[in-house]
């Protein structure tokens, strides 16, 4: 949500996230009720690739759709499988296992995200990089922040500047902005302090599409974005015209 001139408004993206969260909650709630008839688990995650993460009293493992434990409850945390690998935590380190519970990528990361389109974001010594499914670095730990890939690009941050990289780890848009949002519908909202900390929109060629004049700018959804301008919260289209 946005707070603008003391008024809180729900954005389109906020509503989408809320709807998705509610759907996932009820799916997990129903699965939990079936799997937990004998009070075997204290928590259950979402089924993915035939398995769901579950928690006993303290530790996590995985069950199949017959609600049998197929990967022992031995982890500090376990996440839903993606692209054949499950992200798990052991001794406060993140690693990845396959459907049989075999370790495929060792436990050596301080933080990580599940695989998406053949790569995963991992953190080591306070910096984020990218690995492939074999655990090889596509991009060594380099950035202080790395957002989820959107439309093939990820927002990254280093030394209080942000830019964008591709899935090869190559810098596509230089780290020359002071703040930014992930790409959506071909455009990204970015902020430049030298432009009075105003926000504008760029395309994937780093060309300015909408000028740096907004106090607040959010990603586009269905060709509409919410912005703040001259003390007013409004919706604009991709030409910068206000939408009523």
Regions found by a protein language model. Give the residues of each.
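Charged/polar low-complexity intrinsically disordered segments
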Residues: 13-16
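Residue-level detector of conserved, function-critical positions
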Residues: 22-244
